[in-house]
């Protein structure tokens, strides 16, 4: 077994954004934060609390706080304390006093307004400025939604800011499925749960009467695959996130052990591991027709399949060479090639949404690591090292990874951590107690 944990594993509501009427902003200025492997000096930004209209003071403060937290949390941005500001924003459409922001070394300025409408809708408007070029950075936008969607609108603004400055897609308006755990290590209760990427808005999707493991989002974010022991043995279930209705995968013989599921990029089929006698192989299942197909046939354990973004290939782990290694095969099965080339044991491979890297868990010399490698096995880099790090999951922009970290000892507690693909900005993700097996959703908007 690759891991130390005691379970089977071998290893809404927002309207469309619109350009603000009356603001015909020009082309983006030269401000650009390049994401490289070198030392990064966080980009200083100023974010005055958004103006409030119609009694939206609390919402304006909350939206501003979440946007700032999103940007700071990347490790790429540094917020200049508001008490250092020389200028005060009193009119959303007023000209920017660039010299005042240059004087405090702000490189980016984010201004905004939150309006509470009589119909219960909330309108969030924002503008982004390149301070030293003295020019807007892209168009001003507004987002409209129910008042209780303010957090999503804040994340969406942060995604826009992140994207315009880095040139990469954002990842803030996302959710994370995970396993919420409680109780002693030898009798731990597990529930499937979902939350915003920053730990807010936690919702429990199952009770704790049976063990649940390994949730995986569909490409559309509307369904979750996971493994449950509610029948007494591991079986893959599929759940509708909106209704919380669940069912086991169809066309699977009764009392057949299935686990380690993953959706295809189209969401129309799934792959998973199935135990048949003494052998464990990878199968695919067409969700519309129920057609099941065996993809591997080696006399070994094949598991943890993950599709390439274009759906043409599957990366998986196998012990066919004597210990666990990473292999790639065509999506319809066929000859597999080994891509892991280092020492140690490799498992839980996951293809990056960008298609450029494969993330994995590695065990070597009594330590566990989260690492990345190119899809041909080259450029292997270990991003973390601890008593137990496992189960990477990619942010939708392919630049940040979440994973499970567990502390040693009889009371070892699992927690969710994140790290960027250069190994920087390692931090614990807020969860309501112990948590494991994170799975990142696609962007919601």
Curated annotation (Swiss-Prot):
GO terms for biological process: cell division; protein import. Residues 1-26 form the signal peptide. One of its GO terms (cellular component) is periplasmic space. Coiled coil: none annotated. PROSITE patterns: TAT. Pfam families: PD40, TolB_N. InterPro entries: 6-blade_b-propeller_TolB-like, PD40, TAT_signal, Tol-Pal_TolB, TolB_N. The keyword Cell division applies. SUPFAM superfamilies: TolB, N-terminal domain (SSF52964), Tricorn protease N-terminal domain (SSF69304). It is found in: Periplasm. Keywords: Cell cycle, Cell division, Periplasm, Signal. The Tol-Pal system is composed of five core proteins: the inner membrane proteins TolA, TolQ and TolR, the periplasmic protein TolB and the outer membrane protein Pal. They form a network linking the inner and outer membranes and the peptidoglycan layer. Belongs to the TolB family. PANTHER family: PROTEIN TOLB, PROTEIN TOLB HOMOLOG. Part of the Tol-Pal system, which plays a role in outer membrane invagination during cell division and is important for maintaining outer membrane integrity. This is Tol-Pal system protein TolB. The gene is tolB.
